[in-house]
């Protein structure tokens, strides 16, 4: 058997990343150039700043990925790239680099959905069994996805408004926490008590949709009213109460999805999958099913996950022409 090497590029938001995957499961390198420090003072990602940073470092990331993997461009079988969803300017930088590299080295180009990458990062620790259900939770998405077979993704539930990671960052900004706030809120939540009665939107409705805007608004109103009255609120208790509400919503909807779509494997992926509170609740609430969560290093945006998803597309023969364009609002098939 001839070894297959895929070079994958991810630039959908504020991480520039390049990875090399050997065959289906050997991640030889996964270079990540983070821009978090550049965006902290703005309290969120500035698209123009993100694009400029990608331009500055992407060539070096490609060189480092090849060097760390111990291979050359001549060893590669294909080039994969995230083409959506994400920030259009950021996506275009990665795509331009991928297309130029593929053209110069006479390699096929594999287009990869960013969220498929998050989902397939689970392949790094387990040979996934299909059909499976996935809960994808990140700064831009909250989705329940039914995967009948490798590469066959179908959204069966999603948020009507804010993504869960977006809600974390917004309440973190209200409390004066550093962006991104998810990790700090999780840590503070473990030191506090769930004493504030925040809403759990839509958990009694017979559907698989999420809503976090009401929870976010309730949190902001409580914090604002307390400041107006000169009252002191413990951040630990605020975070514990907020996170308890988030986890209740996620668990209720995930259990409903598992009842509607009987599977043997549940994948939890996306940046919010790094949340320790979520991992603890999964152990408590989800029984008699194999729960697979990618390692922390593959939860955030990275090209390693794109490479795992690309391996599936390679086997299916899904390649793109060099006129491939970015799709910032790219989705899976959509709701039933």
From Swiss-Prot:
It is found in: Cytoplasm. Its EC number is 2.3.1.234. The keyword Metal-binding applies. It comes from the Bacteria. It catalyses: L-threonylcarbamoyladenylate + adenosine(37) in tRNA = N(6)-L-threonylcarbamoyladenosine(37) in tRNA + AMP + H(+). Keywords: Acyltransferase, Cytoplasm, Iron, Metal-binding, Transferase, tRNA processing. Fe cation binds at residues 114, 118, 301. Transmembrane segments: none annotated. It is an enzyme of class 2 (transferase). One of its GO terms (biological process) is tRNA threonylcarbamoyladenosine modification. GO terms for cellular component: cytoplasm. Belongs to the KAE1 / TsaD family. HAMAP family: TsaD (MF_01445). This is tRNA N6-adenosine threonylcarbamoyltransferase. It comes from Streptococcus mutans serotype c (strain ATCC 700610 / UA159). The gene is tsaD.
């Amino acid at each position: 058997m001839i070894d297959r090497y895929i070079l994958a590029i991810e630039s959908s938001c504020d991480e520039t990343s390049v990875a090399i995957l050997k065959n289906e499961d050997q991640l030889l390198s996964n270079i990540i150039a983070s821009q978090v420090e550049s965006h902290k003072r703005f309290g969120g990602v500035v698209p123009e700043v993100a694009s400029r940073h990608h331009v500055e470092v992407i060539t070096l990331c490609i060189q480092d990925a090849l060097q760390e993997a111990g291979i050359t461009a001549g060893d590669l079988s294909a080039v994969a790239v995230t083409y959506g969803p994400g920030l259009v300017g950021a996506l275009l930088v990665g795509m331009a680099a991928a297309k130029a590299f593929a053209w110069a080295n006479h390699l096929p180009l594999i287009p990869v959905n960013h969220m498929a990458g998050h989902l397939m990062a689970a392949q790094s620790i387990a040979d996934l069994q299909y059909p499976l259900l996935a809960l994808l939770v990140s700064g831009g998405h909250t989705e329940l996805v039914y995967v009948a077979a490798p590469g066959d993704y179908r959204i069966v539930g999603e948020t009507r408004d804010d993504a869960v990671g977006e809600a974390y960052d917004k309440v973190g900004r209200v409390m004066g926490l550093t962006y991104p706030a998810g990790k700090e809120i999780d840590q503070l939540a473990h030191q506090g008590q769930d004493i504030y009665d925040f809403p759990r939107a839509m958990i009694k409705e017979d559907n698989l949709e999420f809503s976090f805007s009401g929870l976010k608004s309730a949190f902001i109103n409580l914090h604002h009213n307390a400041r107006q009255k000169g009252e002191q609120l413990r951040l630990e208790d605020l975070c514990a109460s907020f996170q308890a509400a988030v986890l209740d919503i996620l668990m209720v909807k995930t259990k409903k999805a598992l009842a509607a779509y009987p599977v043997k494997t549940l994948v939890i992926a996306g940046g919010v999958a790094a949340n320790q509170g979520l991992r603890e609740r999964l152990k408590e609430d989800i029984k008699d099913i194999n729960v697979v969560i990618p390692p922390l290093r593959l939860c955030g945006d990275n090209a390693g996950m794109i490479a795992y998803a690309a391996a599936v597309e390679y086997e299916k023969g899904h390649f793109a022409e060099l006129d491939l364009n970015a799709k910032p609002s790219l989705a899976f098939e959509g709701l039933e």
